[in-house]
Regions:
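Membrane-embedded alpha-helical segments that form the functional core of polytopic membrane enzymes
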Residues: 51-72, 127-131, 185-207
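Central hydrophobic cores of alpha-helical transmembrane segments in multi-pass inner-membrane proteins
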Residues: 40, 44, 62-74, 108, ...
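Interhelical loop and helix-boundary elements at the membrane-water interface
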Residues: 12-37, 80-103, 120, 135-167, ...
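Solvent-exposed interhelical
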Residues: 67-106, 115, 201-242
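Transmembrane helix-loop-helix
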Residues: 53-58, 101-147, 235-286
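Functional transmembrane core segments of multi-pass inner-membrane proteins
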Residues: 158, 162-206, 213
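Core segments of transmembrane alpha-helices
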Residues: 37-40, 103-109, 164-175, 238-246, ...
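Juxtamembrane boundary at the C-terminal end of a transmembrane helix
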Residues: 305-311
Length: 311
């Protein structure tokens, strides 16, 4: 950490503008602002796939929910950060703990209020997803029942973290919009859009966990990389990416999804090849890693926006 700090001082002296930009980006990723933007962008992609109108309040609902859940889960999983070799991020969390609480509670309340304003069903979707997210690290099963269930917390279930993250993102991104919009969408589009969001957010969660194996093992957080190991996890991610791209191509060719599916499938494959060829076997620094996975979703949202605008 001392060497890292010295390198940062050298970079700041050599290029103060770049150092300032990196500090801003570090704050945005540490506070999960970029994660919220990525989630909102992905929700827009889901709306385009379903052929539904997308409004600002839907974007804000997803943005606030995802950003709040990521921040609040840092308080329910205390002790994880000290196992990560990420001194800059640890310093942000240590110095700005009150701000973190505010950035968790206020957006969480905003997502609940927005869900309520959109209607009964959107409110219930957000409420249920929020309760499950907050209960993830809480001991919900009494100790005396441990022998019957085999677990006390939801996070004790094998690979539970990745499944819960993907399910929450997909549920909040798809169903509030589906329940509110008056236009009808085909059941096949609803199902395929949900599967698309579930898979891409699941891949994101798994890929991030590959670099946090040591911390997850120490705190007992069950993830796919811990269950399968790094080698088999990489194989699983490759299979999911290729399968998702092929599925999008087929769905577009059969008319089950609109033409944007062609573009999304190609974008996913290009991103996959970029990661395989450029970063194979190399661990990315935390800032670059988080920015890369979030920008992947943000660019997908921009592609969907341009496609709809031109169409």
């Amino acid at each position: 950490r001392v060497m890292t700090h010295l390198r940062e001082l050298e970079e700041a002296d050599a290029n103060p503008v770049l150092a300032r930009v990196k500090r801003v980006l570090e704050a945005l990723t540490s506070l999960h602002i970029t994660t919220g933007l990525a989630a909102g962008s992905l929700a827009y992609v889901g709306a385009v796939l379903m052929g539904l109108h997308f409004r600002l309040d839907f974007f804000l609902l997803v943005f606030f929910y995802v950003q709040a859940m990521h921040v609040l889960n840092r308080f329910t999983e205390t002790g994880v950060d000290k196992f990560r070799d990420d001194p800059k991020r640890q310093e942000i969390y240590r110095r700005h703990r009150i701000i973190l609480w505010v950035l968790g509670i206020v957006p969480f309340a905003a997502s609940i209020v927005l869900g309520f304003m959109l209607g009964v069903w959107p409110f219930l979707v957000v409420l249920i997803a929020s309760i499950l997210g907050l209960l993830y690290s809480v001991k919900v099963v009494p100790k005396s029942w441990m022998g019957l269930f085999g677990f006390r917390r939801l996070k004790d279930l094998a690979a539970s973290k990745n499944v819960f993250v993907a399910s929450a993102w997909a549920l909040v991104s798809i169903f509030p919009l589906f329940f509110v919009e008056e236009q009808t969408t085909q059941p096949s589009r609803l199902l395929l859009s949900f599967v698309f969001l579930f898979v891409v957010t699941g891949i994101r969660s798994i890929w991030l966990d590959l670099s946090d194996l040591a911390a997850d093992r120490l705190v007992g957080r069950e993830t796919v990389p811990l269950v399968l190991g790094p080698t088999r996890t990489h194989s699983l991610v490759r299979t999911l990416i290729v399968g998702l791209s092929v599925g999008l191509y087929l769905a577009a060719a059969l008319g089950w999804l609109p033409g944007i599916a062609w573009i999304l499938a190609t974008w996913i494959l290009l991103e996959f090849l970029y990661l395989e060829l450029l970063y194979r076997g190399n661990a990315l620094p935390t800032l670059e890693r988080d920015m890369l996975v979030d920008l992947h979703f943000i660019v997908a949202g921009l592609l969907a926006f341009v496609w709809r605008a031109l169409g």
